[in-house]
């Protein structure tokens, strides 16, 4: 059977809570930043639930020896935030995965063509074999930025099966493109909205995540 794009919208009350705060146009920049970070934290918990390799062990409690299980941190982990909005997710996701290496990719959308232009690429020429990669892209509108980043990862030996994407808001146009180009991909998003406007912004969305994170256009 051919692989099919998997997208999960976790039914967690704290995800809905922080999403509501992030959507509210009255939310000030510091609180918006907190909301995005918290969404990153809870989405990361969900994304790695059955994804991280573990190793069995035994520990001695104050009373007896008992079986235990630990994350196998010898397996390479990477976090790839897509700048600039992806920066809002980095710190909280890194707290969930403290051993992960971070590789920044900076993309700016052309306001006419809506296509991404790369101004920063800190990915190595080749990632470690069997790396697990979390890509942070808060707004999946047209999908151009994520597709560009996935192409960069593919060229460095990373398959879609090795990647999980964290997004705050996703829209059908992006998901359709991703399902065609990378059907084996897995995405975790706080919500899927209905449409894009004529400027390529998600509606209802939450506005420009980068502008609201940093208080600057």
UniProtKB/Swiss-Prot annotation:
Matching CDD domains: PRTases_typeI
Reaction equations catalysed: UMP + diphosphate = 5-phospho-alpha-D-ribose 1-diphosphate + uracil
Ligand binding (uracil): 202, 207-209
Function: Catalyzes the conversion of uracil and 5-phospho-alpha-D-ribose 1-diphosphate (PRPP) to UMP and diphosphate.
Binding site for 5-phospho-alpha-D-ribose 1-diphosphate: 84, 109, 137-145, 208
Pathway: Pyrimidine metabolism; UMP biosynthesis via salvage pathway; UMP from uracil: step 1/1
Organism per entry: Synechococcus elongatus (strain ATCC 33912 / PCC 7942 / FACHB-805) (Anacystis nidulans R2)
Family: Belongs to the UPRTase family.
GO biological process: UMP salvage; uracil salvage
Top-rank taxon, per record: Bacteria
Gene3D superfamilies: 3.40.50.2020
Name of the encoding gene: upp
Names of the cofactor(s): Mg(2+)
Listed name of the protein: Uracil phosphoribosyltransferase
Cofactor note: Binds 1 Mg(2+) ion per subunit. The magnesium is bound as Mg-PRPP.
Keywords, ordered alphabetically: Allosteric enzyme, Glycosyltransferase, GTP-binding, Magnesium, Nucleotide-binding, Transferase
NCBIfam families: PRK00129.1 (NF001097), upp (TIGR01091)
Pfam family, one: UPRTase
Record comment: activity regulation: Allosterically activated by GTP.
UniProt GO molecular function: GTP binding; magnesium ion binding; uracil phosphoribosyltransferase activity
EC numbers: 2.4.2.9
């Amino acid at each position: 059977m051919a692989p099919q794009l998997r997208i999960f919208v976790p039914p967690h009350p704290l995800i809905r809570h922080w999403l509501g705060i992030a959507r509210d146009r009255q939310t000030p920049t510091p609180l918006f930043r907190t909301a995005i970070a918290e969404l990153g934290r809870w989405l990361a918990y969900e994304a790695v639930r059955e994804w991280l390799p573990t190793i069995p062990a035994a520990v001695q409690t104050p009373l007896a020896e008992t079986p235990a299980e630990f994350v196998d941190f010898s397996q390479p982990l990477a976090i790839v935030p897509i700048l600039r909005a992806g920066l809002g997710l980095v710190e909280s996701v890194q707290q969930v995965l403290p051993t992960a290496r971070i590789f920044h990719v900076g993309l700016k959308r052309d306001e006419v063509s809506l296509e991404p232009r790369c101004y920063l690429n800190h990915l190595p020429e080749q990632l470690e074999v069997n790396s697990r990669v979390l890509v942070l892209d808060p707004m999946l509108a047209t999908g151009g930025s994520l597709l560009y980043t996935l192409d960069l990862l593919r060229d460095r030996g990373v398959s879609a099966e090795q990647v999980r994407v964290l997004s705050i808001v996703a829209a059908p146009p992006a998901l359709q493109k991703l399902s065609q180009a990378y059907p084996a991909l897995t995405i975790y998003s706080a919500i899927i909205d209905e449409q894009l406007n004529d400027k390529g912004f998600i509606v209802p969305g939450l506005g420009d995540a980068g502008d609201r994170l940093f208080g600057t256009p």
